[in-house]
Amino acid sequence: MDFKENSIYINVMDKIYAREKEVLSQNQDFQENNLSRISLILNYEDFSLKFDESLHGYSFGYVTNPFGLKLHSPFTETVRFDGAEKYIYMKRILGVPSNETQLCNYQHQNFEEKDSQKELLPSPQQLTPPTSLPSLPLLPLPQAPEQNEEQQLTQPPSPPSIPPPPPQKKQIQIFITPSGIVSQKIQNFFRDTQIKSTDPVNCSLDHSIKKNYSLEEIYENNKNYMDKNNNFLHFLFTFIDKITIKDLDHFEKEINRVHNIKKLINQQNMKGETPLHSLIINNSESCLKKLVIAKINHMGIFDYSKCDNLNKNLLAHAIEKGDIDVIRLVLIGGCPLKMSPRSKLFKKNFKIYRQQIYRVFEIKEFLTKIGFNQYIPMFLEFEFKNININYLIESFKFKLNINEDEILLWKLLTEPYKNLDFKSFCSEYQIKHQNDLISETMANHFINVCQLNPHFGYIDFHTQIGSAGNASVFEGTYKGIPIACKEMPVSGTYEQSVDSIKEIAAVGQIKKLGCATVVETIGVLKYNQKLFLVMVKEKCNLLSFLCNKSEILKMQREGIWTSIFKISKDILKGLVSLREAGMYHRDFKTANFLVSNTGKILISDFGTSRDENEKRLNTFAKTIGTMWYRCPRLGDCSEDEKTLTHYNEKSEIYSLGIILWELVCVAMTGTYISPKIPLFQNEVDFLIWIHKDYRFSFPVGTPQSFVKLITRMCLPFRDRRPTVRQVLDNVKAIKKEFLSNRGIEGEQTYSGLECWREFNFSKQNVTRISISNLHNTEYKVVNKYDYASYNNKNSLLMKRYLDNSNFVVELINPNGLFRFKSFFEKEKLLYLKLKSTYKDEYYFDMSQFLTTIIQIHQITVIYYKMLQKYRELRLLRNNNNINKNKNNNNNNNNNNNNNNNINNNNTFNNSTNNNSNDNINIPYDFNNNNNNNNNSCNNSKKFKSISESTSALGLEASSSSSSSS
């Protein structure tokens, strides 16, 4: 070896050792976890340096053992060599092709040409490769302190044809410590110790089998190479490679010759890993993994119940690797399942096959019970091809020779999640059968639900899609049908267990009548000490449907009022069906109605439902239902009015009135408006406020028929509310009214004509406008582009946007300076909407609002009158005295103008009072402000002047409208 080649060789070795020391010095955990299994006492020639091509054009060095197997250590994958170094080293020093496969084949050819007689290890002076023949690369040998390492490496090679015999039959071995430094004490210890060892060539497994060496002899010769925790099979299965082991029949023969093979295959190291654990965990070839596991299964010598220190068995590691064939073989061997369907392991890897994995255990149990263990692989093949086992029963009936009783037993075993009966459930959860808790009728309804599906197959549910009260709802599939599994809180308190029975019994009571307006129930599933109510999964709930803008646009294209009428009729028909079944739902809201794929509205969530004949009347407390949909007088009466504390049919009419109000607001505004009142954060404040006979406001233009119906449904005293049948008849009558007035042109006397035209703002002859009941609202000039501050709930903002090819103006409440010049557009109809907001959300129930259609010059009048009122109320910030004087002069002029406008508008107000609502579109008279304020929600004197300015503004707008028309 010339000086240039020797320098490259030394450079490569220096890189390897330097990188190894750097990695080990920085990461102590890496040293303990990865080097503990390969800290071996190795012969000098037992390692060779090889190269691998990387994806980025670099070459990585790695070290091989006597079998030609790759040893993974910190420096094997981090040392990079440039192209010149690799080419010179592979071509000139090794003298063999750079391809790894060709290199190994070349080595095996040399192995067969050598003598089969075992050779002793030569001296260190003989280890340098000859220049003429190809040889394996060598690691630098650490020398004794009196000998320089660099001089050792630069010694000229000795010709291989005349090998001088060693002075003593001693083997020179090195010990690679975790820090990568050779221990001098161990080296001196083995210098005078003669250990039996085979030649590196003869240590190859293929060569050993060919020379009739047994694995037991190989293990005895190589046990010093392994650490004390791993046996030979750990070592073999960890570094198994496709090149060295090609015929596992020889492998099986040699395993049979080992007397303690069963002990070795089940031996665990410090990490609790068996040799099969090492086989699956390490990056060995998948085909070899399958062959080795198949041979071990055939021999039946491995205990699959063994787990490592992390409590993971072979199945858990196989799932982490994601190899379906390895999982199948592990299951055939009898590996138990120690994970739930919703475990992190299943969520991370292998979601598709978890259902089959669970079914495999039931199939194995059944086949073992009837004595057909040999058919387990056949059925597993079908299971892992996504074929349901139920379809195979008839096909294999004759082959397995089983009768009908055994087939029934098969179904019970392969479908383990069977329905439970009432008695077993009550006895398990210690529920007493008392008349005041669970009646016989309720028990019968419970049993009927359990018998809806006699035998459940495996239900795959893993994703939580929502919650209903204290219960979680999961999404899953059953026989190809999307389902929703509601977890029943049976493992909690005694009351929760009883409530679960009552909910299931309520479903059975409704199911008995065949109500088509209730979500379809499949049955009851008991799984993992939990109870699940299995239902068909629908599209979404009604709340999500109304909040979805795309769905609203779709309804507008098809006719939004037609959709609203259909939804209202489905909801009312559902309530009628509950009344026929003698049930009270007690929690009606949009979130508890489901929208099916066909657009039908179905009732769901019977967690608070009760039978009308239930004797425990104290269950009808004021806490039932959702706060914003709850009857206001419920549970808030004196003891003399005990009958009002009971829940009845009229109590649910109030909740339906709120739902109809939500639907009407969607039809009128095109957006969903929540009935939630954010000012009241607790239940007590809500009850105090709701007892003031508060009525929700309606957008202007709402049909009077709907206004009157919803107002009657939401009356504080329930005796005055209509029945369900009356509400259904009224909705049908309103629909006829809609169909008869929708096509009439030019009719201006009908209130809400534009509403019936479904946002078709094409009319040019708008006769009047009115601004009413803007109480508790300060007028403030705001900026169109400033949306940062939403803290002041009483300020206003005018914003323009385009809706159905019509310009729309909104008054909302961010602070700032408003620019009005962009609104001067002629012959365009604008939609003016006054809103009061709170925390970036719109609520119509904060005050009275206005919705009307006006022309563009009317907006300018309103705008300039606003500015005049600002100056009157001194809301504009003026720092100079001159500006204050100007404002005072302007205020005097404005007061005179306002008085004139009021006097001129008295006749207009008298003519329009007959056609207006009690709460909507009532023009204000400046002289009658006190009377109007008494009818409002707030009688505070704080906003008296503001209310007067609001009324005056309404009169001015009305006068401008009448003059312009």
Swiss-Prot record:
UniProt entry keywords in alphabetical sequence: ANK repeat, ATP-binding, Glycoprotein, Kinase, Membrane, Nucleotide-binding, Repeat, Serine/threonine-protein kinase, Transferase, Transmembrane, Transmembrane helix
Keyword check for Isomerase: no
Gene Ontology cellular-component annotations: cytoplasm; membrane
Membrane topology label: Single-pass membrane protein
EC number(s) stated in the UniProt entry for this protein: 2.7.11.1
Disordered, as annotated region: 114-170, 881-942
Main localization of the protein described in the UniProt heading: membrane
The reaction(s) this protein catalyses: L-seryl-[protein] + ATP = O-phospho-L-seryl-[protein] + ADP + H(+); L-threonyl-[protein] + ATP = O-phospho-L-threonyl-[protein] + ADP + H(+)
Alphabetized InterPro entries for the sequence: Ankyrin_rpt-contain_sf, Kinase-like_dom_sf, Prot_kinase_dom, Ser/Thr_kinase_AS, Ser/Thr_Kinases-Pseudokinases
Low complexity bias spans: 119-136, 144-155, 881-940
Keyword Flavoprotein: no
Family: Belongs to the protein kinase superfamily. Ser/Thr protein kinase family.
Descriptive protein name: Probable serine/threonine-protein kinase DDB_G0291516
Organism for this UniProt entry: Dictyostelium discoideum (Social amoeba)
